[in-house]
């Protein structure tokens, strides 16, 4: 008559089976073709001149706009930001002041938020997070957000808005 296995062996075997059941199986092992990761364009720095090329004037170009130095691809909102659309004036530039003031006045279509009221700054943060970050992919940053005028690093840069990406995909 066979002796029953000691309990520790059964527990070890059960733990091993459970661990193997919970480990994800790579798709190549499962006989599936791996799908490429769904990624947008690589994140990059934009000068004012480069960003201006994406102002919605060219039919075959994406439409970019920046708020708080973060560049968003708003092409999916072409009816709002494309050529002749109501908010086209915001496209192709950092229009943080205009967004904060809810203004399309050319004097307000700038990155400069100096002199804005607390209420306007709160409105800017609200639109930034609830509209742009919630709806549109981040494709980069304005050079001004990362660098000072003299080329030195901007110590006020906070990477909280930076999307997760692999550096190898950026070059």
UniProtKB/Swiss-Prot annotation:
> Which Pfam families does the annotation name?
Cyt-b5
Free-text tissue specificity from the UniProt record:
In the embryo, expressed most abundantly in brain and spinal cord. Widely expressed in adult tissues including brain, heart, lung and kidney. In brain, expressed in neurons but not in glial cells. In the hypothalamus is expressed primarily in the paraventricular nucleus (PVN), with lower levels of expression in the arcuate nucleus (ARC).
Protein name as catalogued:
Neudesin
Name the major location.
secreted
One molecular function GO term is: growth factor activity
What family is it from? Belongs to the cytochrome b5 family. MAPR subfamily.
Establish whether keyword Heme is in the entry. yes
The Cytochrome b5 heme-binding domain sits at: 43-128
On subunit structure and binding partners, the annotation says: Interacts with PINK1 and PARK7.
List of residues that carry N6-acetyllysine: 135
> Signal peptide: which range, if any?
1-30
Q: What is known of its domains?
A: The cytochrome b5 heme-binding domain was proven to bind heme, although it lacks the conserved iron-binding His residue at position 81.
SUPFAM superfamilies (UniProt xref):
Cytochrome b5-like heme/steroid binding domain (SSF55856)
Q: From which source organism is this entry? A: Mus musculus
């Amino acid at each position: 008559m066979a002796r029953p296995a000691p309990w520790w062996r059964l527990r070890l075997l059960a733990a091993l089976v459970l661990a193997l059941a919970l480990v994800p199986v790579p798709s190549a092992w499962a006989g599936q073709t791996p799908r490429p990761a769904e990624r947008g364009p690589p994140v990059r720095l934009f000068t004012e001149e480069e960003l201006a090329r994406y102002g919605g004037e060219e039919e075959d170009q994406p439409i970019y706009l920046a708020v708080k130095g973060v560049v968003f691809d708003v092409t999916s909102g072409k009816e709002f930001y494309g050529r002749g659309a109501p908010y086209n004036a915001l496209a192709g530039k950092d229009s943080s002041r205009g967004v904060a003031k809810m203004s399309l006045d050319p004097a307000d279509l700038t990155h400069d938020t100096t002199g804005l009221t607390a209420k306007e700054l709160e409105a800017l943060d609200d639109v930034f997070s609830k509209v742009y970050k919630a709806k549109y992919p981040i494709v980069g940053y304005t050079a001004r957000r990362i660098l000072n005028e003299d080329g030195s690093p901007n110590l006020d840069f906070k990477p909280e808005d930076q999307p997760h990406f692999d550096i190898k995909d950026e070059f």
